[in-house]
UniProtKB/Swiss-Prot annotation:
Pfam families: DUF444. It comes from Sodalis glossinidius (strain morsitans). Belongs to the UPF0229 family. InterPro entries: UPF0229 (IPR006698). This is UPF0229 protein SG1344. Transmembrane segments: none annotated. Residues 50-59 have a biased composition (Polar residues).
Amino acid sequence: MAYFIDRRLNGKNKSMVNRQRFLRRYKSQIKQSIAGAINKRSVTDVESGESVSIPNTDINEPIFHQGRGGMRHRVHPGNDHFVQNDRIERPPSGGGGSSGQGSVSQDGEGEDEFVFQISKDEYLDLLFEDLALPNLQKNQHKQLNEYKTHRSGYTSTGVLVNISVVRSLQNSLVRRTAMTAGKRRAIRLLEAELDRLANSEPVQLLEQEKIRQEIAELRQKIDRVPFIDTFDLRYKNFERRPEPSSQAVIFCLMDVSGSMDQVTKDMAKRFYILLYLFLSRTYKNVDMVYIRHHTQAKEVDEHDFFYSQETGGTIVSSALKLMEEVIKERYDPNQWNIYAAQASDGDNWADDSPLCHDLLANHLLPLVRYYSYIEITRRAHQTLWREYEDLQARFDNFAMQHIRDQEDIYPMFRELFQRQLNESR
């Protein structure tokens, strides 16, 4: 029975190379399709794959062909309709029209746009391409280092459970080859001499017997070389290395006053989901802290954060104070990469906005990697926006954007996290 072993890198997915080439070639068209599709999804369906359509005009290959008109001589294969010197009428030009996407001919046949499915990973790669986390610094603790075990080559000492059989046998083969190479070479020379004496006249029996004894002694010496020796043994070596902190926490602060309707909350939720997916691709562990506020702030779970009917007036500083308390209790800035995203319609008690400015400037912004504020409203900006504009001018880790419609969410998100020119890729 014959066994075939497929050692190709893409053996299980033989078209992967062509697929990757296609994604690179038509990246701009695919990104345009994704940017439009992100706004049509439900808030719980941001992480799945996507069906992408590309107009046929964008994927047509350039070809060399004869232009229209002119006099040309062609050689056609023979058939039962024409004979030599017959004149063939020019076919009429296509007059079919189309009111939709794709191409339509005069006989009713057409061609749809090219549609294909991209996977979740491909979708997220294109969704977050050219984006980077601002002020990204993986924490390296001095007192509370996190250690992770890594492979670190091989060692000649160790426990039996870590023995490397393959490396040990390789060393055994090298040692036995080195120790017996001279003896095997001598045996080959003696065997050649023995053949010469056997064919020589007169026959030298004593000399032949002496050579046979030498060959036997050499083979005994070769057999006495141990197959495996403690010198050959190699063990897999492991070492513990300090790891930079790879954990982050996102504080989601949302105004739930009476002016924040469900449509506004859904737009805020889309932003929070994009932020979570973006951070989870950078950090291994991402915690979410949900804080709702009206006149009072409360930490809640995800369901209550988006769907609770509790409402009231608006005091934004209550959420900022609660965020500071949670950081002190559970999230040491030396161990956690802290991010915050605040969503509001901008409506706040006028006397509270200066307090929000003070809390952010003196208490929160020194602790967080990045603080983003989105104001979802079609009205004119109020005191909270003006206070935050001063923070944006003073702090590099503070950013703010204005959202009017659902279509603004993804472009605004890219503006907040666009990779800076001086950041390494």
